[in-house]
């Protein structure tokens, strides 16, 4: 399965968009309905910054470590969930406001593990 197929397969239910970002900040895939600043996203992850901004929406980081990034918008505009793909890239997804970020993380992490084999 290709990178695009794996990342795109996540888009259903509560996950509305995905992106795969190399640790350099280079975006190697993003769903057509999303515009992500790859360098910013990687800096938030690496530096454990308190917030991430995607498409002008600020999300407060609630959990970040070497394996994951979980952020939520305090105004109820959804969540950002990310999992590391073998230390090579960060797979992030937008989770709808009614979605459960921790449940989405399980799906995203599983896909990130598959991505690590093809990156």
Swiss-Prot record:
Keywords for this protein: Actin-binding, Cytoplasm, Cytoskeleton
Stored InterPro entries: PFN_sf
S-S pairs: none
Record localization: Cytoplasm, Cytoskeleton
Any one of the GO CC terms: cytoskeleton
UniProt keyword Electron transport present: no
A GO MF term: actin binding
Activity regulation (UniProt): Inhibition of rabbit actin polymerization is reduced by phosphatidylinositol-(4,5)-P2(1,2-dipalmitoyl), a soluble form of the phospholipid phosphatidylinositol, suggesting an unknown lipid might regulate actin-profilin interaction in vivo.
Main location: cytoplasm
Role description: Binds to actin and affects the structure of the cytoskeleton. At high concentrations inhibits spontaneous rabbit actin nucleation. This strongly suggests this archaea has a profilin-regulated actin system, and actin-type genes can be identified in this organism.
Family in the record: Belongs to the Asgard profilin family.
This protein's name: Odin profilin
Organism: Odinarchaeota yellowstonii (strain LCB_4)
Taxonomy of the source species: Archaea, Promethearchaeati, Candidatus Odinarchaeota, Candidatus Odinarchaeia, Candidatus Odinarchaeales
